Amino acid sequence: MNVLIIGKGGREHTLAWKAAQSSLVENVFAAPGNDGMAASAQLVNIEESDHAGLVSFAKQNQVGLTIVGPEVPLIEGLVDEFEKAGLHVFGPSKAAAIIEGSKQFAKDLMKKYDIPTAEYETFTSFDEAKAYVQEKGAPIVIKADGLAAGKGVTVAMTEEEAIACLHDFLEDEKFGDASASVVIEEYLSGEEFSLMAFVKGEKVYPMVIAQDHKRAFDGDKGPNTGGMGAYSPVPQISEETVRHAVETIVKPAAKAMVQEGRSFTGVLYAGLMLTENGSKVIEFNARFGDPETQVVLPRMESDLVQVLLDLLDDKEVDLRWKDTAAVSVVLASEGYPESYAKGTPIGSLAAETEQVVVFHAGTKAEGGEFVTNGGRVANVTAFDETFEAARDRVYKAVDEIFKPGLFFRKDIGARALKAAQK
């Protein structure tokens, strides 16, 4: 069978790498992919926004399964177009992807169906939003309602910071229509974790959890990013906590979507905070997390393609996991997530052993080596029997391949290390 992966980042490289290991698969195509994933997939020069081009390619190349990586094509209805053409595709419809496409929709859904989340209000008026912030005080969280590539959330530690953010979003329209409406919610403190599940309708098959690192710099400082690293398992989150989150959050959310006439097929990603009052939802995403996928899929023992086909065909899904640890560190371009240069030479990025894989995100091949072509450049991922060993291994590999013009966080997994030492 031929498989098509849509997207071009580190998550898509991981999906292609995992799909290529399947005994069911003859060819893996990636559209548009990136130069660094050429060992796992044949690159197809079609942008993820070219829906007609993608459908036509899938038909002409006997693609038996398409996996959509990024959120934008999902929210723009790419899955609906594949289904209309009679093609097997894994991902939510446009109607279901709204759970990520609109923060307000997701919050209202949780309120209606009693799914635990932070208290919130939604605003389109700067003056009303400002008055609310002054009434509530800081710390407080402000989110653009629509998509902003993981950069539409501000955790404001002071009222001044909150009001400046509201000004950016509502007055200066920093993200255009995406920030014309904002959700302001209470600040939650605790231990964060990402719980992804394969979902079809009310059927929910949870994956192992991961922890992501959103802030740009060590010690959780600096602006929010798409994610600077991740690890799995998360020793400070108990199995009981995860089970409880599946029963009280993920399953009810899947059921709620069915009841709303927006039945969800795909990966439902719950970004959760374990607070003193149990797990609460920070956000829902309608796809595989990035960089969480880079540590979760390497721990999957099952054949990913078989899992997705069985799920789509309403068969029993055989989901098994390895009892190993994975740690991934993002190499990013200096200046990310603000402005950064492209075209910086970064060598071969070769650190591949059986226990280290480099998943490429923003890279381009030029003259036999790679140059930077994005904010997040690559995910260096290591696996080992224990978390500590995987973490040591990943940082050794990062030191080997690091080049000027890049930066990375040196404290990925520090919280888990602390928990393991207790």
UniProtKB/Swiss-Prot annotation:
Q: How is the cofactor bound?
A: Binds 1 Mg(2+) or Mn(2+) ion per subunit.
User: According to the UniProt entry, what is the EC number of this protein?
Assistant: 6.3.4.13
Q: Which residues form the ATP-grasp domain?
A: 107-313
Which GO molecular function, any one, fits this protein according to its record?
A: ATP binding
GO BP: any one term: 'de novo' IMP biosynthetic process
Q: Give the pathway listed in the UniProt entry for this protein.
A: Purine metabolism; IMP biosynthesis via de novo pathway; N(1)-(5-phospho-D-ribosyl)glycinamide from 5-phospho-alpha-D-ribose 1-diphosphate: step 2/2
Which InterPro entries is this protein grouped with? ATP-grasp, ATP_grasp_subdomain_1, PreATP-grasp_dom_sf, PRibGlycinamid_synth_ATP-grasp, PRibGlycinamide_synth, PRibGlycinamide_synth_C-dom, PRibGlycinamide_synth_C_sf, PRibGlycinamide_synth_CS
Q: Which residues bind Mg(2+)?
A: 283, 285
Keywords annotated in UniProt: ATP-binding, Ligase, Magnesium, Manganese, Metal-binding, Nucleotide-binding, Purine biosynthesis
Q: Where does ATP bind?
A: 133-194
Q: Which reaction does it catalyse?
A: 5-phospho-beta-D-ribosylamine + glycine + ATP = N(1)-(5-phospho-beta-D-ribosyl)glycinamide + ADP + phosphate + H(+)
Q: What are the names of the required cofactors? A: Mg(2+); Mn(2+)
Superkingdom of this entry's organism?
A: Bacteria
Query: Which residues, by range, are in coiled-coil regions?
Result: none
Disulfide bridges in this chain? none
Which family is annotated? Belongs to the GARS family.
Fetch the HAMAP family from UniProt: GARS
Query: Do you know which NCBIfam families this protein is assigned to?
Result: purD
In its UniProt entry, what is this protein called?
Phosphoribosylamine--glycine ligase
- What is the originating organism of this protein? Bacillus subtilis (strain 168)
Gene name in the database record:
purD
